Curated annotation (Swiss-Prot):
Source lineage: Bacteria, Pseudomonadati, Pseudomonadota, Gammaproteobacteria, Enterobacterales
Entry keyword Secreted: yes
Gene name tied to this protein: spvC
Swiss-Prot/TrEMBL keywords: Lyase, Plasmid, Secreted, Virulence
Record's subcellular location: Secreted
First-tier enzyme category under EC: lyase
Predominant cellular place of this UniProt entry's protein: secreted
Active site residues per record: 106 (proton donor), 136 (proton acceptor)
Protein name: MAPK phosphothreonine lyase
Known function: Secreted effector that irreversibly inactivates host MAP kinases by catalyzing the dephosphorylation of the phosphothreonine residue in the pT-X-pY motif present in MAPKs, via a beta-elimination reaction leading to a dehydrobutyrine residue.
Organism expressing this protein natively: Salmonella choleraesuis (strain SC-B67)
Regions crossing the membrane: none
């Protein structure tokens, strides 16, 4: 399906992502997860499997690269322009109503398999059932071969609390966990080879492609102390335990 490219002179603002910084105050989102961890975890365990209806007629990787300043597909605004090495996708009508709390996933695949990986995941990424309102993928033609987002972390999924008070509901957490497990399975089923996981991220042994970082309380440089702190993040624990 060709990407819809309206003839509109629109300004699409960048993703509202808070940069990592030292000594960040723990936000209420994190406190809520910590204080209600056992209750949320127990609720999630009792919930049925989530089902994700895949979007049809979505652009392939080549089509994404040609999205230019503004395009639309399956309710997502797309843009790939200027010197930005990423192709951005943002749901026009967000499903999550809270403020970004720093939680995000990277997907790392072999450099030459990014188009194949995108083909495997596109129906899920554009799905109306997806819990991810904002995501991006590296434009491999714009990065040098040894760049961080060339060797791995080619996909980034930004997770926002679903509730207006910027707290995660158990149902949304469950849906998100099921979604990332589905992404993992889809890549494996399609024979995609994993890439280099960022030093800044953490992941359990059973994740071959995805990794996690909270960018309000960590930086890109990584280190064992940071990774240990990330492993203790309640959001990460709810995704993995």
């Amino acid at each position: 399906m060709p990407i819809n490219r309206p003839n509109l002179n629109l300004h699409i603002p960048p993703l509202n992502i808070v940069a990592a910084y030292d000594g960040a105050e723990i936000p209420s989102t994190n406190k809520h997860l910590k204080n209600n961890f056992n209750s949320l975890h127990n609720q999630m365990r009792k919930m049925p499997l989530s089902h994700f209806k895949e979007a049809l007629d979505v652009p392939d990787y080549s089509g994404m690269r040609q999205s230019g300043f503004f395009a639309m597909s399956q309710g997502f605004q797309l843009n790939n322009h200027g010197y930005d090495v990423f192709i951005h996708a943002r749901r026009e009508s967000p499903q999550s109503l809270g403020k970004f709390a720093g939680d995000k996933f990277h997907i790392s695949v072999l450099r030459d398999m990014v188009p194949q990986a995108f083909q495997a995941l596109s129906g899920l990424l554009f799905s109306e059932d997806s819990p991810v309102d904002k995501w991006k993928v590296t434009d491999m033609e714009k990065v040098v071969q040894q760049a961080r987002v060339s060797l791995g972390a080619q996909f980034t999924l930004y997770i926002k609390p679903d509730q207006e008070n910027s707290q995660y509901s158990a149902s949304f957490l469950h849906k998100t966990r099921q979604f990332i497990e589905c992404l993992e399975s889809r890549l494996s089923e399609n024979g995609v080879i994993s890439g280099q996981c960022p030093e800044s991220d953490v992941h359990p042994e059973n994740w071959k492609y995805l990794s996690y970082r909270n960018e309000l309380r960590s930086g890109r440089d990584g280190g064992e102390m940071q990774r240990q702190a990330l492993r203790e993040e309640p959001f990460y624990r709810l995704m993995t335990e």
